[in-house]
């Protein structure tokens, strides 16, 4: 299967040559303006299918607030604010995303989720959140984002830096499938096209390995099969404590 996988990956890569050229010319940036429209629709469907899993994951968020104080939470790659409904009442939310075109969707989501306190929207990548102080938040949330960042280890280092001691990094990410499966085969074959469709998304990352090496004192992680499009069925879910 490895030889066939390499061959068909090359075929798909060749078909994507026009997209490679568009990106090289700097024209791909225009897609970032319309990507929030697609993501909003995708997020609604994702939340319907993953509602119970998200509710289960975020149920323990409040446990990481300082005694007698409300939770301070920073979300990396907040997108359209699809996670807001799962955050506890009174939670102070700091939103970050490298795409400034999400802002109007984010504002709408904040109005719909008035049980939260909206702190600020920071246009920043997960790899560089220099404007956020060290050990300043109780929780960092990252869902369907580590598949798209350019540097996973650096993003996790930044999350670790801004978390206070005893704080937690919550995650829900799609990952590469087991090598013995056809899902693994198609993830690799379709990856060249998937990258452009998903605004830099990579379906072939073994993200759990980065989490295991990120230096957290405790890691609670489990693999699940989400009932989604086959390319993103394999998921990891859990949290890591600083």
Predicted features by range, described:
Residues 127-140:
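A short acidic, Gly/Pro-enriched loop at the edge of an enzyme's catalytic core
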Residues 21-34, 38-51, 172-234:
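C-terminal alpha-helical "lid/dimerization" subdomain adjacent to the S-adenosyl-L-methionine
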Residues 45-72, 82-86:
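Conserved alpha-helix/loop element of class I SAM-dependent methyltransferases that forms part
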Residues 153-165:
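A short glycine-rich, Lys/Arg-flanked "PGG" loop and its adjoining helix->strand segment in the class I
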Residues 138-151:
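A short SAM/SAH-binding and catalytic strip from SAM-dependent methyltransferases
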Residues 1-29:
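N-terminal auxiliary segments of SAM/dcSAM-dependent transferases
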């Amino acid at each position: 299967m490895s030889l066939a996988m390499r061959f068909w990956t090359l075929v798909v890569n060749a078909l994507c040559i026009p997209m490679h050229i568009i990106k090289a010319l700097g024209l791909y940036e225009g897609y970032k303006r319309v990507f929030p429209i697609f993501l909003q629709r995708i997020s609604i469907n994702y939340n319907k299918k993953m509602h119970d899993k998200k509710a289960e994951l975020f149920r323990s968020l409040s446990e990481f607030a300082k005694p007698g104080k409300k939770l301070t939470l920073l979300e990396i790659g907040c997108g359209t604010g699809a996670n807001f409904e799962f955050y506890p009442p009174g939670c102070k939310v700091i939103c970050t995303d490298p795409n400034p075109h999400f802002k109007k969707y984010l504002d709408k989501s904040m109005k719909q989720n008035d049980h939260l306190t909206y702190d600020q929207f920071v246009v920043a990548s997960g790899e560089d959140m220099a404007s956020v102080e060290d050990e300043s938040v109780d929780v960092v949330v990252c869902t369907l984002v580590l598949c798209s960042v350019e540097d996973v280890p650096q993003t996790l280092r930044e999350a670790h830096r801004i978390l206070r001691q005893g704080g937690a990094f919550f995650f829900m990410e799609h990952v590469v499938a087991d090598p013995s499966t056809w899902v693994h085969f198609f993830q690799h074959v379709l990856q060249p096209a998937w990258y452009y469709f998903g605004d830099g998304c990579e379906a072939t990352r073994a993200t759990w390995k980065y989490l295991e090496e990120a230096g957290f004192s405790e890691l609670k992680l489990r693999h699940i099969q989400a009932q989604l499009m086959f390319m993103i069925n394999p998921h990891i879910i859990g949290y890591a404590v600083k």
